[in-house]
Structures are given as structure tokens and as C-alpha cells.
């Protein structure tokens, strides 16, 4: 709403899937040092009514609007890709800024995976908690010639874990080595609206999930980290 409409768009003759296009005429877009998307132009608002403090927080010192989104530019044409929200940015112990959304989205594309929580704030590396899709699990087991099992049993099954480790490897291909998932755990229960771990719009309540599974997160960092692979098969396991 602060931009009074779109700032970028994919055109019929200039489209890149996965991006929000290039800047529209009259709108300029740049990235801050931490990757936050900054915009300014004829459609950008000038401030909040009778709220100078909020207005000051919304803009940089040189007048660019802070969107709160993290992104990157692709190609010579400058296609903009949004990778996450600044407030969700994870800063590792080594000072690396990691947007969890790209990793979480790629992992949720695996048929076994229901929900993902990427963690790593002030930790030596990035980790993840995965939950299993109870509806897809029987189909996956059958297609892989495995016996029926409950979600709880599947979360402990080494064959299921091996498939998920490959999925983690594929997700890691989208990010740098420093941003890659090096440790993960499969939870025996899913995140749902009913148990308070998903919002009504089905987004993970990150703070609540981190609090409820604090012991599991601590345990992630007591094991030998995975070594990111560059030879993972592109097929779904």
C-alpha cells in the first residue's frame, strides 16, 4: 500500500519465471547492503499521517522506501526475485545472512514433506526441522516398495531419512555453501492451525515452533554436520 501499486512486472516479451519482473517506468528499485529491497518513485508515499517516527523508520536517509522484503537481481535486464522477509532473516554465528524461504519452499516440493522450519540464528550452520505429509506418505512408501508405517515410525525410518537427506541436498543447490542446510531432524508430528504452529493462512509460526521444539533444535547441533553435495540426482526420491 505504501507504493500505491506495483513497482515491477513481467512483460509478455520479457518474462523470467520465479521473479516479479523489472522496474516499471517511474519506479526505481535497488538493494540495501543486507539485501533488503528499496524502492522510490512517483507512486511511493511520502509518509504516515501525523507519525514522523514511523515515517523515519520506513525510509532510508536518502529517501528510499524500505519494503521489508529480501531479494536479488537476475540477468542483465535486472529481473527482481523476492527471496523472503527481512524480519525472518537468519544471521549465523559467522555473520552470514540467510533467507529461510528459498530452502523451505524447495523442501516442501518433495512429496514426503509437509512443513519445514529452517533455523540457525547465532548457530555455526543452518539446520532444519521437517514434518511428514501424512496423506502422501502411504503413496510414497508403496511406490518405493516399502511396507506401510505410521508417521511416527516413518520419522525414525532410515530409508525415509535417506530420501529426505537427498531432498536437502537438492534444496542446497539453490544457495551458497554457507547458506546450506547442514543438519536436520524429522519430527513425528505436523505443524497445523489446530496445534498453533500454523497461522490461518498456513504460514509457520516461527517463534512458537522454535519455542516448542527448542530441545530438538539444540540436538541438531550435537551431531556431525552434513557435507553439502554438488552431485545430487535431480529426480524426486
Model regions: which residues?
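Conserved A3 ("GATE") glycine/threonine-rich loop of ANL adenylate-forming enzymes
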Residues: 1-11, 24-26, 98, 124-125
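Adenylate-forming
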Residues: 1-3, 42, 44, 48-49, 79-108, 128, 137-157, 177-179, ...
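Conserved ATP-binding/catalytic segment of the ANL
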Residues: 23-92, 109
Amino acid at each position: 500500500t505504501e507504493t500505491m501499486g506495483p513497482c515491477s512486472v513481467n512483460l509478455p516479451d520479457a518474462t523470467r519465471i520465479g521473479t516479479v519482473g523489472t522496474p516499471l517506468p517511474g519506479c526505481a528499485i535497488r538493494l540495501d547492503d543486507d539485501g533488503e529491497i528499496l524502492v522510490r518513485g512517483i507512486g511511493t508515499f511520502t509518509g504516515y499521517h501525523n507519525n514522523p517516527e514511523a515515517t523515519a523508520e520506513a525510509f532510508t536517509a536518502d529517501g528510499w522506501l524500505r519494503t521489508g522484503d529480501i531479494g536479488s537481481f537476475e540477468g542483465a535486464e535486472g529481473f527482481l526475485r523476492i527471496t523472503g522477509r527481512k524480519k525472518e532473516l537468519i544471521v549465523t554465528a559467522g555473520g552470514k545472512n540467510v533467507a529461510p524461504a528459498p530452502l523451505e519452499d524447495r523442501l516442501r516440493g518433495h512429496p514426503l514433506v509437509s512443513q519445514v522450519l529452517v533455523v540457525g540464528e547465532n548457530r555455526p550452520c543452518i539446520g532444519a526441522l521437517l514434518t511428514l505429509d501424512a496423506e502422501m506418505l502411504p503413496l510414497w512408501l508403496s511406490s518405493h516398495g516399502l511396507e506401510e508405517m505410521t508417521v511416527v515410525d516413518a520419522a525414525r525410518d532410515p530409508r525415509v531419512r535417506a530420501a529426505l537427506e537427498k531432498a536437502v541436498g537438492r534444496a542446497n543447490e539453490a544457495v551458497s555453501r554457507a547458506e546450506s542446510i547442514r543438519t536436520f531432524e524429522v519430527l513425528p508430528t505436523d505443524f497445523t492451525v489446530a496445534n498453533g504452529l500454523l497461522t490461518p493462512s498456513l504460514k509457520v509460526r516461527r517463534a512458537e515452533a522454535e519455542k516448542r521444539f527448542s530441545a530438538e533444535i539444540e540436538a541438531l547441533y550435537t551431531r556431525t554436520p552434513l557435507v553439502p553435495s554438488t552431485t545430487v540426482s535431480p529426480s524426486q526420491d
